[in-house]
Structures are given as C-alpha cells and as structure tokens.
Amino acid sequence: MQDCGGLRLVELPAALVAASPTLFVQHAMATQIALASLPDVSELLRNLLDGPHPAVAGRLAGGFRAIGRQGLADEILGAMRGAGYAVNEVNPIEKPLHALLPGGRAESPCVQRLRLMWAGMREQVVAAFPPASGAPKDIDALVKDVEARYVTDAYHSLSIEGYRVTAALIEKVRDGGWNPDGDDKDRSARDAMAARGYLETHKLVKEDLVRVIKGQNAGTVFRQALLRWVQALFRTSVQAGILKPTDLAGYRNDQVFIRGALHVPPSKEAVRECMPVLFELLEAEAQPQVRAVLGHFLFAYIHPCMDGNGRLARFLMNLMLVPAGHVWTVIPVEGRNEYMSALEQASSLANIAPLASFISELAEAQAEGPLAPPR
C-alpha cells in the first residue's frame, strides 16, 4: 500500500496481479494505460513469483504483447519458466489501443489517456463537421469579419465565465474609454478588467490567425502563443495588484476543481507532462476541425491555468477553425448548460459526439450570419 494525498492505494504492480480477466474487457482503456505505464516488470515479477501466480503471469504477458511491449512479455515468461512454473500466454485484451507508447517508451497515465482520447475521438469529430472551404485568400476581409464579431464574442465568452458585462462596456474598453490609470472606479472594476484582458488577447489571436493562414503549423503557433495569451488576459489584474507577476509565469501551481463537474483536472505535476503532448497532438493533426474540437476539449480537460481556461480554450478553437475557412464561432451564453454538459460528457464518459455536434452546428449557423449583437 502507498499513501497518495491521504488515500491508501494499492501499488500498481500488485493491482495488476489482482486484476481479473473481465477487468481488461470492462475497463479496457484503464488497464491498457496501466500496462503501458510500467517502466519495467521488476516489481511485477516479485508479486508474480511470491504468489505464485503462473496463470496471472500468462495473462499479463499476453497483455503486454498486445500493446506492443514484447520485451516485457518475454521477461515475464522467461522469469516464471526459469523458476519452474508452467506458464501459458493468454491475451486478455480484445481491442488493443494502438496510440500507446510512441517509440516504445513508458509514459505517465495522464499522457497515455490524452493520446488514447485523441485517437479514439477524432473520427467522430470528422464525421460531425462539413468540409472546410480552405484557407481564406483575402486576409484583410477575414480580419475585418473577425473584428465585426468581436463585441458579440467577448460578451458571450465573458458571460459564460460569470462576468457581468454589456455591449456598451465592451465597446468602451475597446474604444479606449476605460482608464484604470486615471480613474479609481475604473481601476477596481473587475468586469472591465476582464473585458480589457479579453481585448488584448483577442488582438494577439488575430495576429496568430494570420500566421496560420500564411502557412505556419497551427499547433506550433499555439505552442508559441499560449504564454503570451495568458499574460495578455491577466496583465490588467497584475497592474491592479490583484495578481502577482509570478502568477503569470507558467502553468498552475495548485489543484483546481470545476464547479458542478465530475471531472477533476490533473494534478499540477501532471499538467507539465500533459501540455507538451497536447502541443504534439495539435502539430501532428491534419484535420482543422479535429484540432479545434479536441484542442478545445483537452485544453479544458487539463485546465493548465489557475483561471481563464474556458476563454483560452475558445480562442484555441477559433485559431484552428478560422484559417481552415470557418467563421469565427461564438459559443452563446444561452447555450451554456448544453456546452458544459457536452464538455462533461467528453471528460467523464469519453463521449465527444455532443461537443463536436454542438460546435459544428454553431459554426454552420454563424457562417450564414453572425449572432445578433447583445443588447
């Protein structure tokens, strides 16, 4: 047993030895991730030989071989047979998940789960979206269209996060009428600070859209842009003394929870393992709608920042959609419950279809005409 945050947990090698054959069928992803997470079989062999457990050894050897870890399978068989036990290899895995172990190296369970979710969900996303029209040829016209949708986008994105904003406030901030340096009331206005941060980040996203349209890899652009986006989103809060500059230095340094959700984001340590893999997945994915939906979902799933994750996820979504020929897509606050439910379905039940359909329908509808401006 080991203590993990106050919980007494069975160590992984012992848990694998105790796992029944049906567990590999009923919880295929979890058991295969467990097999893929072991760096070697030293502790596993101690448990197998101590039993002894020759039948279990045959099952685990078959499981390792099924996910591509032939070396570990052979080690188990060799050690057990060398100790005098008759071992028959049996594969307990009905459907190997082949996104595991790129290059044959062990990775953390969180990283394995990201890869498996991406591989398992992408075809559903492709099926939910109509074909994109391709990179826009008139970049100036595209930027003007994005700017024309800005007030509506900022209103809905900020409202989803609980800020009390109006079109008038967003326009005042955009037009330079908000003066935190010369007006104490403006300096302390939380909603206006959020609107200012959104404006500054939106400007950066527009620049990054152009980089992608001109041929740069969208995943690489996002990798390079994320920290700048975070700093722009919260710079005003630092200037007001609400946040310290070190709060914007990188990923979160504490655990976060999502109100009303079953899903608990990964630990702060796991965030540092997961984010490079998310960037890799975005960089390697050819389909923009997959980058948009799964990028949005997995960014929210990881929740790498202490705040602003929803806004950043929606910026990421549009960074992937717009250069492919889709319009800048606004998620309306009126659809918040459906939106949050779709994210929860994806996070807790591995069902991406509701989120893919939700975003696809919004993108199609807004291609016909933008959402009505907020009153």
State where each predicted segment sits.
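FIC/Doc superfamily catalytic core
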Residues: 1-375
